[in-house]
Amino acid sequence: MHENENMDLRTQIGQHFVCGFDGPTLEPSFIEAVKRYKIGNIILFARNIKSKTQLYALCQEIQDLVRSECGHDALITIDQEGGMVTRLSPDCTNVPSAMALSATGDEQLARQAGVITATELRALGVNVDFAPSLDVNSNPDNPVIGVRSFSDDPKQVTRFGLAMIEGLQEGGVMAVGKHFPGHGDTHLDSHVALPVVEGGEEQLAIHLEPFRKAISAGVQGIMSSHILFPALEPDPVPATLSRTIMTDLLRSEYGFKGLVFTDCMEMQAIADHFGTVEASLQALQAGVDVVCISHHVELACKAVELVEAALADGRLDADSLKQSTKRILQAKTMLSEQEIL
């Protein structure tokens, strides 16, 4: 299943996108996008989920559609962190936030929260959780992370973050540590602005520690941040679009071999400054595996066309993309073969 030699180009490109849709049922426009543009992965929000029964049926419908059109399982993704960041319906289990778990001082509770979350998600048909936040919340004015972080202490974030990752992956769901290389020292929210982290190497090392340790411990996914890090990337591009950060640091220096996802490319940090469609190509050029376009699937369709053109004229290296596709398909195989608790 993980060989991509016989996959046509559009189907291959579609593997590199995760997209969302409105409502609790598949929209005709979304179905058409999967059929024409071979979108291979889905993100779910609260807008898609009314009950456990409905979510299970929806996930089965998504898998049937994607398998028939793309020939492979879909990554069905969700932001189910616990606490304030929950997408599931009230008849599902919502574990406490990262900071609440950390306040107990017992990281085994974080592991158990991960197992509970993953077991339920997997039973409902979801196989990727964009959690936990590995951000070190060192800025008290941070408007977006706050209690989503385990702590302002990198060792505490590492201890609890690794425990939750272990629990999620033990439960058969891919854990995705976010927001690399750290969203904890910002006073702006990348949903609505383009933050800059001005710290030098010593300061950045604090924020990188949980990610470095999570990679060593076997986290299967990492999500990028739409933040400028001048100490890491001298050009005025956020981490998501930086080959220096996404490939040289994350892949080469830290040795990460799992899947790299972008944060949503419709966030204003990207959309207002770089353009969602154009930045999707830049993210793939930087070494990201899966581009997330959460709300407007027509933007993903345009991005697929742009990637096709970039492969044709050499702006995007075909061999590098093939290696990335192989990682995605291997991850899908791994998830499909895992036993569910």
Outline where the language-model segments fall.
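Second-shell residues forming the walls of enzyme active-site clefts
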Residues: 20, 26, 48-70, 74, ...
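Glycine-rich anion/phosphate-binding loops
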Residues: 51-58, 103-119, 153-159, 202-205
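Boundary/entry segment of secreted carbohydrate-active catalytic domains
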Residues: 2-25, 81, 164, 263
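A charged helix-plus-loop insertion that forms the helical arch/lid used to bind
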Residues: 92-105, 149-151
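Mid-to-C-terminal alpha-helical segments outside catalytic/metal-binding sites
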Residues: 309-340
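Catalytic domains of carbohydrate-active enzymes, especially glycoside hydrolases
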Residues: 32-45, 116-118, 123-128
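Short, conserved phosphate-binding/catalytic loop or strand-edge motifs used
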Residues: 134-144
